[in-house]
Amino acid sequence: MMARSLDANGAAKVYIIGRRHEKLDEVAASAVNKSIIPLQGDVSSKDSLGACAAKIAAETPFVNVVIANSGSTGPTLNGLPKDRTPSITEVYEYLWKPSMEEFNDAFTVNSSAMFYTLVAFLPLLDAGNKSPASPTISTGIKSQFIATASINGFSRKPGMGFAYTGSKAAAIHMIKTLATWMVPYDIRCNVVNPGIYPSDMSAVSIFAFHVLSIRWKDLFLRPVFSTGLNFH
């Protein structure tokens, strides 16, 4: 959705990075202005991120915005009883079952990968502020890094799970500190914290709340039913 919006609104080049090349190709093919360029890569790998940044740098002298939009749920709480308070034994056995690697995967994708995505593109973002060919010169809009976290990062309830909520809270605070730390470099850092929004990841949650009884477009595009967004 973000890539298509940038394409539709006149972005010269929109690079999208993901592990599934066929999905990237589908997005690129659907672009109105055909400015979306797919790159297969894994944002949880420094080597892969570095290779993607190097490829983009070889094709364009600068970028104006980098968006970190990947996400992972980690172990969820969906297997615990919903109609009663689970016993402490049930809680222990359920929470102890997933491996620490599964738990850490959410932090790798939602927090660490977000950070290294910014770092990988710092030289190109800096060039976006300085290149004579950059629209920054005429518009005055500085280079930007935007991350997607979650409204769950502010919640006292675990939501999709402790790994997910904790990793999103970490991402939110990291962007807050980066927003301050990047001031001398004129690189803006912001985080978007969506509520429940229709996507492959949220499909289970939407179904659980019986949202599917109403067409999602009717529900989410009407302000009275909107789950909202939070910006920082």
Regions of interest found by a model, annotated:
Residues I17-E22, V43:
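N-terminal Rossmann-fold cofactor-binding loop
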Residues N33-I37, A54-A68, T73-G79, S99, ...:
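A glycine-rich helix->loop->beta "capping" turn
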Residues S72, L77-F107, S112-F115, V119-P184, ...:
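Catalytic loop of short-chain dehydrogenase/reductase
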Residues V191, A208-H232:
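C-terminal helical subdomain
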Residues N193-V204:
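Short, flexible catalytic-loop segment of classical short-chain dehydrogenase/reductase
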